[in-house]
From Swiss-Prot:
Spans annotated as Domain I: 1-64
Domains: entry comment: Has three domains with a flexible linker between the domains II and III and assumes an 'L' shape. Domain III is highly mobile and contacts RuvB.
BP GO annotations: DNA recombination; DNA repair
Name of the protein in question: Holliday junction branch migration complex subunit RuvA
Amino acid sequence: MIGRLRGLLVEKQAPEVLIETGGVGYEVQMPLTSFYELPELNQEAVIYTHFVVREDAQLLYGFITKQERALFRLLIKTNGVGPKLALTILSGMTAGEFVKCVEHDDIATLVKLPGVGKKTAERLLVEMRDKLKSLMEASHGNEREFVLQSNYTPAPVVNTAEEDAISALLALGYKPAQASKAVSSVFEEGMDSETLIKASLKSML
């Protein structure tokens, strides 16, 4: 199993990255909360990974912290939640925000995420409550460990910011009409693609 990668960040297009180590390039899918914590291209990156083997593919999912990876692993053990939906959940909200949703039985926020209907949200609240309690105890009850503090610095603005943002939202499972509407509603002149993606996601929660 591949549990950790340290290498050169060669490609970076939300929600996927390519990290080269030992002459091998690893394609990794990441939740946007972790994606925003990555360094600039051609710099060294260190991520914790979860390796999934399917009949038709072998996939790597990456995270900046062990805590977020631990939450991802708990999510995919929930009935009806696979890696893709777990990634979408952790892209739409931070790990800390998800913990608060479970603590407060906040179905209304969860159902705003693509792929999460009322039944799935209810199942998440029920099944994750005890699992999160164990996870928090393992972290000494410190919820701050689940909240990523971003040191993100906007990249130079490019003309394709809106296109990049829409593509990222589509990759997360949003419908074309939803993605276009969300991006258009928050777009301001001078926004780079990553800032636009974050603002678009926030507008839909």
